[in-house]
Swiss-Prot record:
Residues 102-229 are annotated as: Interacts strongly with spindle-regulatory protein D1M1. It comes from Homo sapiens (Human). The gene is NEDD9. GO terms for molecular function: protein tyrosine kinase binding. This is Enhancer of filamentation 1. The lineage of its organism: Eukaryota, Metazoa, Chordata, Craniata, Vertebrata. Changing residue 780 to E: Abolishes interaction with PLK1. The keyword Transmembrane does not apply.
């Protein structure tokens, strides 16, 4: 399966960590060449400003959906396309099994390598035009006048004298497709190697069929994925992603490799009371208090064997040992020691109020563990009667704070805003001119009700997240941002209050058709009209508030203490919690809620007596939980300073180059403006011929000859200005300048060429010879049509930037304009001298 080139927008800035990774800024538009390239899950091969490299897929967002294409007979291997074009190697296409061939026998052309592997039936012709199928773009680039369009880079012609010609690269085999070489020695992709000197398909000679039937290559051929790729797939993932190793107790062998998912292993099958104990302890987020759940534990519950389940369960869960566990009730205190509570999943114990250091440490761990838990469950858990830290909670503003890194917060906010806009759009799609009539309401009453409920739900989720961001702003030293966000939030809250009230009133009347259907126009608005009018204003207010939060995300959002910032963190956090209707809420953390608020996975069993940490010692807790996160690479100070120095030096070099480029562009702009402002002279009385033109015995009158010579000189001057403008435009395209730059240069090209059109129109009105008038008019009209084409091509190149196809089309049209302008100038000279 392959994908066509897609466009993707960068959601965040990306600083490359290796030579193959691509650097980009937030908002850049990248061309996605391949997803999950080279078997690297989550890494995409992209192109930006003429450079290619791999980028993390969770840092970009596709602008359009993926379009799959199957390997048809019209598709050719990328590495062999230009070789086939220039006759250096002949590759054969496998017919598409979905293409309904004329008969059941595949027709294969003879091999030009004379290997004799494929035997072709003698009765079938092998005409070359039937064998090779060259894409239309390549045919035009070779035989047409538009010039080559090779690879994914924009090719600009080179100016030679008063014209432009395309220069073909010297070696197409290496420079056609700008794709990094494969790191594997075997063919993983469904593309024959371009440098193969032998037969295309590696089929053993012993399997040749003399019947002339196409022999499908075995699984060991080029098209098969080598076993090493499948075998090393897990190894590749572990090298590319920083997955934590499973936690194992010292001295315990790795009895069985448990799965990656957070599901307790099924090696032990409890029955009876054991099963009851398991379900009472394994279900996180149960509504009953913790003390009540402990009462259901059987005091005679035997602990699992040390070598059977505990070791495997410890392998399945990677949770710090520093997290303390709840003690059982007083009646089961004889079983409260850690060694007899192995296998019982429990909720972490509160830290005593006087142990401040240990409490802060466990709070940090809890924030890390709870960062993906739903906020609805968090709000419900605030009434837990077993929490002793509720009296120690901070101010209300701090209770609602969002402890997220900026990238995760921005992505989550964008999803909420998009869901809100989609909900309002679906409601507006149902509102028509006669949508309140009885017939329409009878058909669409359920759809309207669903759309109203979705708008209210999405707005509620959006407000839930935004309030947390406003709470973060309240903790900043400067309150200017907080006051601004509070004003913008107030508008959205007012709208939400109106929508909630009107929705409640609509539910009170049970959405009765007799009440909602209106056959006559009336001046009074009912609840449904009021809901629609207010819902229209919500996306604009939400967009303004979202823009404010995105702009100040670095100041508003910071990870909480103890949280980890991984490169693929945003994707993993966003996918950890799902909400109805596609919404996702931000996690609001309450310092006193971490007891009743359970994990999405069961907690590990208590540690054995030899390995159980001292719950009364905060120092031991600090030491133990740090050991469990030793897989996190902490960058040293020297390495960090060295990288920062390199980045600063690179940034300074880029700034200097940018300043030099901007200075050159500014001077070029000024020169072009001076040339453009020069008008076309119409006063022939002040004109003196620059050179003596040869006279002939043709029927051209002296007055027409003088006019042709006069405007030929004018055309020569403005033609040079046109070439200078084209040079500036091609320079912008070659340096990958944005649309605002090359569009401005294209205007100079159009204005310069328009002066030539003006000269042609003036000559058409002033010359007396009919044949000369017709020739000048035809040439002038051709230039005018070419200008219209350039305007459209420039517009498409700007709209589809950075599409190389659109840019290349603009370059082709401008090149054609230079040729037509040169022909127009030459025709004036010919008509004046012959």
């Amino acid at each position: 399966m392959k994908y066509k080139n897609l466009m993707a927008r960068a959601l965040y800035d990306n600083v490359p960590e290796c030579a193959e990774e691509l650097a980009f800024r937030k908002g850049d538009i990248l061309t996605v060449i391949e997803q999950n390239t080279g078997g690297l899950e989550g890494w995409w091969l992209c192109s930006l400003h003429g450079r290619q490299g791999i980028v993390p897929g969770n840092r970009v967002k596709l602008l359009i959906g993926p379009m799959q294409e199957t390997a048809s007979s019209h598709e050719q291997p990328a590495s062999g396309l230009m070789q086939q074009t220039f006759g250096q190697q002949k590759l054969y296409q496998v017919p598409n099994p979905q293409a309904a061939p004329r008969d059941t026998i595949y027709q294969v052309p003879p091999s030009y390598q004379n290997q004799g592997i494929y035997q072709v039936p003698t009765g079938h012709g092998t005409q070359e035009q039937e064998v090779y199928q060259v894409p239309p773009s390549v045919q035009r680039s070779i035989g047409g006048t538009s010039g080559p369009h090779v690879g994914k880079k924009v090719i600009t012609p080179v100016r030679t004298g008063h014209g432009y010609v395309y220069e073909y690269p010297s070696r197409y085999q290496k420079d056609v497709y700008d794709i990094p070489p494969s790191h594997t020695t075997q063919g993983v992709y469904d593309i024959p190697p371009s440098s193969a000197k032998g037969p295309v398909f590696s089929v053993p000679v012993g399997e040749i069929k003399p019947q002339g039937v196409y022999d499908i290559p075995p699984t060991k051929g080029v098209y098969a994925i080598p076993p090493s790729a499948c075998r090393d797939e897990a190894g590749l993932r572990e090298k590319d992603y920083d997955f934590p190793p499973p936690m194992r107790q010292a001295g315990r062998p790795d009895l069985r490799p448990e799965g990656v998912y957070d599901i307790p292993p099924t090696c032990t099958k409890p029955a009876g009371k054991d099963l009851h104990v398991k379900y009472n302890c394994d279900i996180p987020g149960a509504a009953e208090p913790v003390a009540r759940r402990h009462q259901s534990l059987s005091p005679n519950h035997p602990p699992p064997q040390l070598g059977q389940s505990v070791g495997s369960q410890n392998d399945a869960y990677d949770v710090p040992r520093g997290v303390q566990f709840l003690e059982p009730p007083a009646e089961t205190s004889e079983k409260a020691n850690p060694q007899e509570r192995d296998g019982v999943y429990d909720v972490p114990l509160h830290n005593p109020p006087d142990a401040k250091g240990s409490r802060d440490l466990v709070d940090g761990i809890n924030r890390l563990s709870f960062s993906s838990t739903g906020s609805t469950r968090s709000n419900m858990s605030t009434s837990s009667t077993s929490s002793k830290e509720s009296s120690l909670s901070a101010s209300p503003a701090q209770d609602k704070r969002l402890f997220l890194d900026p990238d995760t917060a921005i992505e989550r906010l964008q999803r909420l805003q998009q869901a809100l806009e989609m909900g309002v759009s679906s409601l507006m799609a149902l509102v028509t001119t006669d949508w309140r009539c009885y017939g329409y309401m009878e058909r669409h009453i359920n759809e309207i009700r669903t759309a109203v409920d979705k708008v209210e739900l999405f707005l509620k989720e959006y407000l839930h997240f935004v309030k947390g961001a406003v709470a973060n702003a309240a903790c900043l030293p400067e309150l200017i941002l907080h006051n601004k966000m509070k004003r913008e939030l107030q508008r959205v809250e007012d709208s939400h209050q109106i929508l909630s009230q009107t929705s409640h009133d609509l539910n009170e009347c049970s959405w009765s058709l007799n009440i909602l259907a209106i056959n006559k126009p009336q001046n009074k608005c009912d609840d449904l009209d009021r809901f629609v009018m207010v819902a229209k204003t919500v996306p604009d207010d939400a967009k303004q508030l979202t823009t404010t939060i995105n702009t100040n995300a670095e100041a508003l959002f910071r990870p909480g203490p103890g949280s980890l910032h991984l490169k693929n963190g945003p994707e993993s956090i966003m996918n950890s919690t799902e909400y109805p209707h596609g919404g996702s809420q931000g996690q609001l953390l309450h310092p006193g809620d971490h007891k009743a608020q359970a994990h999405n996975k069961a907690l590990p069993p208590g540690l054995s007596k030899e390995q159980a940490p001292d719950c009364s010692s905060s120092d031991g807790s600090e030491r133990s939980w740090m050991d469990d996160y030793d897989y996190v690479h902490l960058q040293g100070k020297e390495e960090f300073e060295r990288q920062q120095k390199e980045l600063l030096e690179k940034e300074n070099i880029m700034k200097q180059n940018k300043m030099q480029l901007e200075h050159h562009q500014l001077s070029q702009f000024q020169l072009l403006e001076q040339e453009i402002t020069k008008p076309v002279e119409n006063d022939i009385s002040k004109w003196k011929p620059s050179q003596s033109l040869p006279t002939t015995n043709s029927g051209v009158s002296a007055q027409d000859r003088q006019l042709l010579c006069f405007y030929y000189d004018q055309c020569e001057t403005h033609f040079i200005s046109l070439l200078n403008a084209i040079d500036a435009l091609f320079s912008c395209v070659s340096s990958a300048q944005p649309p605002r730059i090359f569009v401005a240069h294209s205007k100079f090209v159009i204005l310069s060429a328009h002066k030539l059109v003006f000269i042609g129109d003036t000559l058409t009105r002033q010359v007396t010879a009919q044949d000369i008038r017709n020739k000048v008019m035809n040439s002038s009209n051709q230039l005018c049509e070419q200008l219209k084409t350039i305007v459209m091509a420039t517009k498409m190149a700007a709209l589809h930037y950075p599409s190389t196809t659109a840019l290349q089309e603009m370059v082709h049209q401008v090149t054609d304009l230079s040729r037509n302008a040169q022909l127009f100038k030459r025709s004036l000279l010919e008509m004046a001298t012959f």
